[in-house]
Swiss-Prot record:
GO terms for molecular function: structural constituent of ribosome. It comes from Alkalilimnicola ehrlichii (strain ATCC BAA-1101 / DSM 17681 / MLHE-1). Keywords: Ribonucleoprotein, Ribosomal protein. This is Large ribosomal subunit protein uL29. GO terms for biological process: translation. The lineage of its organism: Bacteria, Pseudomonadati, Pseudomonadota, Gammaproteobacteria, Chromatiales.
Length: 65
């Protein structure tokens, strides 16, 4: 997901997106721990998506404060 796509969303949509990504990361970490993770690069991709969402969320909340 691109940051430009995230900037078009509102704060509630970004928070929902963050929740989804955190759940996805949790599931991938469980798969990794049990040796079932077929593509380890997915974990890195989700981690970076979480960072992008958090960055855009902080930009939006800092703009309102």
């Amino acid at each position: 997901m691109k940051a430009s796509e995230l900037r078009e969303k509102d704060v509630t949509a970004l928070q929902a997106e963050l929740g989804e990504r955190l759940k996805e990361r949790f599931n991938l970490r469980i798969q990794q721990a049990t040796g079932q993770l077929a593509r380890p690069d997915q974990l890195r991709k989700v981690r970076r998506d979480i960072a992008r969402v958090k960055t855009v969320l902080n930009e939006k909340t800092a703009g309102k404060a």
